[in-house]
Amino acid sequence: MLRLIVNYPLIPKISHRVCSNSSSKLGSYYDSSSIIKYGGISDVVGKKQELFLSVSVKAVEDKGNNGGGSMSFSGQSWDPSSEIEVPSDQRPVNEYSSLKEGMLYSWGELGPSEFFIRLGGLWLVTFTVLGVPVAAASFNPSREPLRFILAAGTGTLFLVSLIVLRIYLGWSYVGDRLLSAVIPYEESGWYDGQMWVKPPEVLARDRLLGSYKVKPVIKMLKQTLIGTGALLVSAFVLFVFATPVEDFFKTTLGSTENQPEVSISRTSNKFNIRKEQLLRLPVDVVTDDDLAAAAAEAADGRPVYCRDRYYRALAGGQYCKWEDLVK
């Protein structure tokens, strides 16, 4: 945006013949100029004199640092040195430029569709590389598929939410500094903090950037955080009730996974033996096949010798779980 303020000086009346050319500098950016030329002519002595005024303006692109070049106008108290006291990297307009060039923070200036496409791609890559291996170490995908998928998806969504939160905090910080009339800065370190009051021209420029460039980004990031938060809460609640849901689906679909439990109960009723007693029959199961089958089902498919220290040591402890070994 190029702003030009022209002050028209009062040209005094000339009582004698005027034939002169002069130029006066009104105001300029560092790379622009405005020149006014004036002169008078008279045909005959005693006649009414005429005076003409011509203004020629030349403006080129401002080549100041990061679009924040200083300006100088006659009749105004602000001069280019008003921003010199603040280090270049701590000026809000330069912080905004650095934010736009950042690899991650630049996502904020994308359109909503492209922004959500990138978030979806990030979620998919994180889910494949990190979420699935971690969830598989905690939940068996074949026995607990619902809890496995929920654990992997919820963990990945949480990481993506943290990244969106980091982007939001960066844009919110720069937006506050652009909209504020007084900002803190440090001359050389944390121990010499100062406060800088923005001149009116700088404040108008910064608030224009903050209102039309930063606020829409912050609004979109807020909506994204609210959406991811709602998804996280829903996934967590579903994860808590995942086991009852899995049991419901197994019962509804009539899966055959419940048949071993039925056979265990029938065999237990046949021998009138409890499950705890079936697990402590390392000797009797040698001669009774039905009793051995019931004991194997009660042990969840593991060898019965896992519950006996002597036979476990004799067999080498193969196929035994850790809770069996510590007992």
UniProtKB/Swiss-Prot annotation:
Residues 1-59 form a transit peptide. The keyword Nucleotide-binding does not apply. This is Protein CONSERVED IN THE GREEN LINEAGE AND DIATOMS 27, chloroplastic. The lineage of its organism: Eukaryota, Viridiplantae, Streptophyta, Embryophyta, Tracheophyta. One of its GO terms (cellular component) is chloroplast. GO terms for biological process: response to iron ion starvation. Mostly expressed in seeds, leaves and flowers, and, to a lower extent, in roots. Disruption phenotype: Stronger growth defect in iron-deficient conditions. PANTHER family: PROTEIN CONSERVED IN THE GREEN LINEAGE AND DIATOMS 27, CHLOROPLASTIC (PTHR34214:SF3), PTHR34214. It holds the Pfam family CGLD27-like. It is a multi-pass membrane protein. Keywords: Chloroplast, Membrane, Plastid, Transit peptide, Transmembrane, Transmembrane helix. Its main location: membrane. Residues 66-88 are annotated as: Disordered. Required for growth in low iron conditions. Induction: Accumulates progressively upon iron deficiency. The keyword Transit peptide applies. InterPro entries: CGLD27-like. It is found in: Membrane; Plastid, Chloroplast. The chain crosses the membrane at residues 119-139, 148-168, 225-245.
